[in-house]
Amino acid sequence: MKLLENSSFEAINSLLTIETGDCKIIGRIESYSCKMAGDDKQMFKQFCQEGQPHVLEALSPPQSSGISPNKLSHSLDDGEGPLSDKCSRKTLFYLIATLNESFRPDYDFSRTKGHDFSKEPSVNWVFNAVNSSLSAAAGEAYSHLQPQLWEALDKEISLAECDIYSYNPDLDSDPYGEEGNLWSFNYFFYNKRLKRIVFFTCRSVSLFMAPRDSGIGTELDLELDEGSYEEEEEGNMDEERYGALCA
């Protein structure tokens, strides 16, 4: 997978970091070529040892489907119902390789399976889901960005021709699984004709619960620390004055 340069995406990504007072939105959009070269070919060869490229892999139902755990269990046994959505192992490899490239070098998704992904119902559904999440969290800041974002996506990947997948991992496999993460989404817009994937990932992080090493909330911590230091200094000065008077 090769990251493709896109000046429109770079401009949008600079606007997809939004602080709202109690949380911070962090998002990015990236375009990848599915043409394999070098390490990708070797990884694909190893991947195919578990099954041929044309073999279909079962996916999980979209999170929007509202399927009960009991019904989901039956679907696993029957191979029908909500898990009827499938993709070829070659497509699955593209999704995993995109994750590896996007989150490199901090995460390795080589053990990721088909059930960690879902195929979304339609472009319109994803459009509404993304807009709903970002509008609720970022308000006017996102409403100004929304037309530009979807226009750039359509120009790069031709949305009407896309199959859209999402990555919905368990907590242990989630790159956004740290304390303080409020919500996240990971969408892959795959255009088979163009041999291209656009990856749109976004999360919302609480400024009050962010881990120390995240860098989020650091300014607030510094202000509080400075305030405590000033109070301590004032206390020491009072003690010195009191000691001088007693002497």
UniProtKB/Swiss-Prot annotation:
This is Repressor of RNA polymerase III transcription MAF1 homolog. The keyword DNA repair does not apply. Residues 61-73 have a biased composition (Polar residues). GO terms for cellular component: cytoplasm; nucleus. InterPro entries: Maf1, Maf1_sf. One of its GO terms (biological process) is negative regulation of transcription by RNA polymerase III. It is found in: Nucleus; Cytoplasm. GO terms for molecular function: RNA polymerase III core binding. Residues 238-247 have a biased composition (Basic and acidic residues). The gene is maf1. Residues 59-83, 225-247 are annotated as: Disordered. Keywords: Cytoplasm, Nucleus, Repressor, Transcription, Transcription regulation.
